[in-house]
C-alpha cells in the first residue's frame, strides 16, 4: 500500500490537470506496486512526492501561500496514503485536497502575463488559451454528469473502464437486478466471481450471496442457491444477509427445522436486526406458530418502526387465527405504504370477500385490472404470484379468479 499510494497521488494530480472523461470513473483498477521497481513508475512517483514535500518546506518563508497550497494538498491525502486500510483510490478524495491546488497555478499565470506586459498580443493569447481550457473542462464536466442520469449508465461506463474489477461487475448486476433484468444481473454476478478481483472478503461474500439470490429467485434452484449462500457464510460470517436468505432458502426447500436454526444463530449475533426478526416471524408463520410469529413481527417493527413488511406477517397470522378485522387493518396499513403491492391486494380481495365488503372488493379488483394492463388474469397471476415467494400470504389462484369474476358479474 505504501508503495502504491504515491502513484495514486500523482494520478490525482494528473486528473486535475487533464480531467478528460475517459480518465474519470467511479472505481479505478490500480496496479499494485510490489517493489520499488515494479511497476517502474513506483520509484519516480515516490521521488516526486518527496520533492514536493521538500519544496513545500523550502519555499515556506519566501512564498508562504504557495508552500501552504502544496502542503495542504499532500496533508489531506496523508490518511489514505498511510497504513490505514482504505480502498486505494476514489476520485472524491481529491475534492478537499484540490481546494488550493490551483492557487500556485494562478500565481504562475499572473506572473507570466505580467512578464509580457509590453506584448499585448502575447497576453491576449495566454488569456484566450486559459479561457478555452476552462470552457473545455466545462464540456467534460457536462458530458460526465450525463452518466449520472441513471445508475445503469454509470455502472456500464465503469465496467468499460475497469473491466477486470469484480466490484464493478457486481455493481452493474445490482442495477440490472433492481430494474428486473435478472438474467443480465446473474451474468454480471458470475463475471464478478470469475474475475476474482475483490477488494476484501466481504465483497466476495456479497457476490456469493447475490448469486444465491439468482439461483433461488431467477433460476428456481434452491439447492444451488443454498450452496452459494453457505459459501458466503463461510467466507465472511459477519455478513448477516447470507444467514437471513439461507434460512428463507431452507424454508422453500421444506427444511423448516434447519431454517429456524439458521435464523436463531443469526439472531444470537445480531439481536437487534429487524430483518432477521422478520425472517424468523415468516418461518414461524409458515410452521403454524402464529402467536410466536406475531411476537417476532412486532419485535421487527419495534427495532425499526420504518419497516412495513412485518405488517404482512401480522396480517396473515391474524387471518389464520380467524381475526379477519385485524387482518384487514394490517393489510390496509401495509398498502398505505405500498399501494401496488400484489401480495397485499390479493390478500384483501379474499378478505373483503369474506367480509362481504363489495365496495372495497371491487375497488381493489379495479386497481389490479389497471396493473395487469393487457394481460389476462391467468398471465398476470402466473407472472407475478410466483415472484412473491416466499411471502406471508400465499394466494389461491383458482379462488381469486372466481372472486374477481363474481365481482365483475355483481357490479354489472
Predicted segments with their positions:
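Membrane-interface amphipathic/re-entrant loop segments adjacent to transmembrane helices
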Residues: 1-60, 77-98, 106-114, 136-167
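Position-specific recognition of the canonical hydrophobic site in helix A of tetratricopeptide repeat
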Residues: 177, 209, 216-217, 244, ...
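Structural marker of alpha-solenoid helical repeat scaffolds
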Residues: 161, 195-199, 235, 269, ...
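Membrane-interface junctions at the ends of membrane-embedded or membrane-associated helices
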Residues: 105-129
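Terminal, low-structured helical/coil segments at or just beyond the last alpha-helical repeat
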Residues: 360-412
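Helix-start (N-cap) detector for alpha-helical repeat units in TPR-like alpha-solenoids
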Residues: 166-167, 200-206, 240-241, 274-275, ...
Amino acid at each position: 500500500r505504501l508503495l502504491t499510494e504515491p502513484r495514486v497521488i500523482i494520478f490525482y494530480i494528473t486528473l486535475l490537470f487533464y480531467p478528460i472523461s475517459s480518465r474519470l470513473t467511479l472505481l479505478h483498477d490500480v496496479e499494485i506496486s510490489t517493489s520499488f521497481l515494479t511497476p517502474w513508475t513506483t520509484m519516480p512517483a515516490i521521488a516526486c512526492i518527496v520533492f514536493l514535500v521538500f519544496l513545500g518546506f523550502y519555499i515556506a518563508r519566501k512564498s508562504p501561500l504557495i508552500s501552504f497550497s502544496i502542503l495542504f494538498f499532500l496533508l489531506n491525502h496523508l490518511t489514505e496514503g498511510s497504513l490505514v486500510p482504505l480502498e486505494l483510490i476514489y476520485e472524491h478524495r481529491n475534492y478537499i485536497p484540490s481546494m488550493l491546488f490551483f492557487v500556485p497555478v494562478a500565481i504562475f499565470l499572473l506572473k507570466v502575463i505580467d512578464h509580457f506586459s509590453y506584448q499585448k498580443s502575447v497576453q491576449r493569447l495566454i488569456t484566450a488559451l486559459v479561457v478555452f481550457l476552462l470552457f473545455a473542462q466545462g464540456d467534460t464536466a457536462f458530458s460526465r454528469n450525463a452518466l449520472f442520469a441513471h445508475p445503469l449508465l454509470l455502472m456500464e461506463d465503469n465496467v468499460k473502464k475497469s473491466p477486470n474489477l469484480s466490484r464493478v461487475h457486481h455493481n452493474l448486476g445490482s442495477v440490472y437486478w433492481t430494474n428486473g433484468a435478472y438474467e443480465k444481473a446473474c451474468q454480471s454476478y458470475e463475471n464478478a466471481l470469475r474475475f476474482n478481483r475483490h477488494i476484501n472478503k466481504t465483497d466476495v461474500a456479497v457476490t456469493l450471496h447475490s448469486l444465491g439470490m439468482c439461483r433461488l429467485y431467477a433460476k428456481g434452484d434452491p439447492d444451488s442457491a443454498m450452496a452459494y449462500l453457505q459459501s458466503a457464510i463461510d467466507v465472511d460470517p459477519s455478513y448477516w444477509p447470507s444467514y437471513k436468505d439461507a434460512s428463507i432458502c431452507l424454508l422453500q426447500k421444506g427444511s423448516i427445522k434447519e431454517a429456524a436454526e439458521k435464523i436463531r444463530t443469526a439472531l444470537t449475533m445480531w439481536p437487534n436486526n429487524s430483518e432477521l426478526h422478520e425472517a424468523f416471524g415468516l418461518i414461524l408463520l409458515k410452521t403454524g406458530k402464529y402467536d410466536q410469529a406475531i411476537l417476532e413481527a412486532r419485535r421487527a417493527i419495534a427495532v425499526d418502526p420504518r419497516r412495513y413488511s412485518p405488517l404482512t406477517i401480522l396480517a396473515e397470522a391474524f387471518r389464520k387465527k380467524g381475526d379477519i378485522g385485524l387482518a384487514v387493518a394490517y393489510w390496509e396499513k401495509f398498502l398505505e405504504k405500498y399501494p401496488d403491492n400484489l401480495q397485499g391486494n390479493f390478500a384483501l380481495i379474499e378478505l373483503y370477500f369474506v367480509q362481504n365488503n363489495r365496495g372495497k372488493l371491487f375497488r381493489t379488483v379495479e386497481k389490479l385490472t389497471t396493473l395487469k394492463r393487457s394481460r389476462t388474469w391467468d398471465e398476470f397471476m402466473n407472472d407475478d404470484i410466483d415472484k412473491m415467494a416466499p411471502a406471508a400470504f400465499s394466494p389461491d389462484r383458482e379462488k381469486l379468479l372466481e372472486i374477481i369474476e363474481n365481482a365483475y358479474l355483481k357490479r354489472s
